[in-house]
């Protein structure tokens, strides 16, 4: 079997944890500065919009993003592992993960358009191709 397609999936899992830690490391000090008495009872992350600095919230926005579209990536990789995959699939998986990590860093640290949108569109296009590859592998 070609290079392991599970490796880029595992890298994205670890990257998601890195973003969780980055989010916590920036939100914690921001919340201490704000004072939790300013939060409504049962407040959630989205309730922090406008209360803590935008650049702190960007990390949370990206963490949430990593729990959305990448679920399709994980499903496609799983299907390919079960149905068979080739070097192109592994390359696409790595490309998707690399672009998603670059997108994460950009969104969390800079968050300017159009670069962020371009990174998202590129990763989405790669994911769409990988999803079609997964479908074809099942036929």
Predicted region positions:
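N-terminal signal-anchor transmembrane alpha helix
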Residues: 3-44
């Amino acid at each position: 079997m070609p290079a392991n397609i599970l490796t880029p999936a595992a890298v994205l899992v670890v990257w998601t944890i890195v973003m969780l830690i980055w989010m916590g490391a920036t939100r914690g000090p921001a919340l201490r500065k704000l004072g939790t008495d300013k939060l409504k009872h049962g407040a959630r992350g989205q309730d922090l919009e406008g209360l803590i600095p935008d650049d702190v919230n960007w990390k949370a926005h990206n963490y949430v993003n990593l729990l959305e579209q990448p679920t399709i990536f994980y499903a496609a990789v799983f299907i390919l592992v079960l149905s068979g995959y080739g070097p192109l699939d592994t390359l696409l998986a790595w490309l998707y993960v690399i672009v998603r990590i670059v997108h994460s860093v950009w969104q969390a640290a800079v968050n300017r358009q159009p670069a962020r949108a371009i990174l998202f569109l590129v990763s989405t296009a790669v994911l769409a191709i990988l999803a079609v590859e997964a479908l074809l592998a099942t036929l």
